[in-house]
From Swiss-Prot:
Modified sites of kind Asparagine amide: N70
Pfam families cross-referenced by the UniProt entry: Toxin_8
Protein family membership: Belongs to the conotoxin A superfamily.
Domain notes per entry: The cysteine framework is IV (CC-C-C-C-C).
Spans traversing the lipid bilayer: none
Keyword line: Amidation, Disulfide bond, Ion channel impairing toxin, Neurotoxin, Secreted, Signal, Toxin
An example molecular function term from Gene Ontology annotations: acetylcholine receptor inhibitor activity
Post-translational modification remark: Contains 3 disulfide bonds. They are not indicated here, since framework IV presents two different connectivities (I-V, II-III, IV-VI and I-III, II-V, IV-VI).
Signal peptide coordinates: 1-21
Protein name (Swiss-Prot/TrEMBL): Conotoxin Bu23
Propeptide stretch(es), residue numbers: 22-37
């Protein structure tokens, strides 16, 4: 397998895990519960994006205390 294929398979696995995990949640958990679950799955992504808005972080994904206002 090439590197690109391995990355694609990894991302699809993360996506599938996220969908299954989110389906088992109740809607009352809200956005914070979803972010916490994703943070457990892909911690390096959220570390890079936390506290700023960039090409991989098109919207604010952190608590309001550390996340700058968009616009």
């Amino acid at each position: 397998m090439g590197m690109r294929m391995m990355v694609t398979v990894f991302l699809l696995g993360v996506l599938a895990t996220t969908v299954v995990s989110l389906r088992s949640n109740r809607a009352s958990d809200g956005r914070r519960g979803i972010v916490n679950k994703l943070n457990d799955l892909v911690p390096q992504y959220w570390t890079e994006c936390c506290g700023r808005i960039g090409p991989h972080c098109s919207r604010c994904i952190c608590p309001e205390v550390v996340c700058p206002k968009n616009g």
